[in-house]
A protein has these predicted regions:
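Short loop segments at secondary-structure junctions
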Residues: 27-29, 83, 140
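Metallo-beta-lactamase
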Residues: 92-147
Length: 147
């Protein structure tokens, strides 16, 4: 069963369980959008291979935000591919410290989120491996990865 679903000619959804990542094929190589939970790099790379592409061609990693379910495997993806990383300025503190969430975040939405919280978030905070962001992103400009 493939863990890559082709959305358009050059865009794939990479299925990783509770969260997904996306893969964009550009003239400059592959752009991975998000890196899932910690220890999911092999799952990501397997899904990239399911798309018919090579994980070694990942040149850019764009994080939608710095929470553990989107940035957890980022450090390992970057280390194994040599890709450049991109994140919004507002997430730099989380990413630089490898923190799962802003310390002020609390779960109050019912039993299912509480169960997820208890299973995946350690009391006092869950961490992932911190890494350096190569370039910050702003929603006020556009970006091209094919130059």
């Amino acid at each position: 069963m493939s863990n890559a679903f082709q959305i358009s000619r050059n865009l794939w959804e990479l299925k990783m369980g509770m969260v997904n990542a996306y893969l964009l094929e550009t003239m400059d190589g592959l752009v991975l959008i998000d890196a899932g939970w910690p220890n999911k790099t092999d799952t990501i790379f397997s899904a990239v291979q399911d798309s018919g592409l090579d994980p070694k061609d990942i040149r850019h990693l764009v994080l939608t935000h710095g929470h553990i379910d989107h940035a957890g495997s980022a450090a390992e993806v970057l280390q194994r591919t040599g890709a450049r990383s991109y994140a919004h300025t507002a997430d730099l503190d989380l990413i630089n410290e490898g923190k799962a969430e802003d310390p002020g975040t609390s779960v109050t939405l019912g039993i299912i989120p509480k169960i997820v919280y208890l299973l995946f978030i350690k009391p006092g905070g869950t961490t992932y491996k911190a890494f350096a962001v190569d370039q910050t992103l702003s929603l006020e400009r556009s970006y091209r990865f094919d130059q």
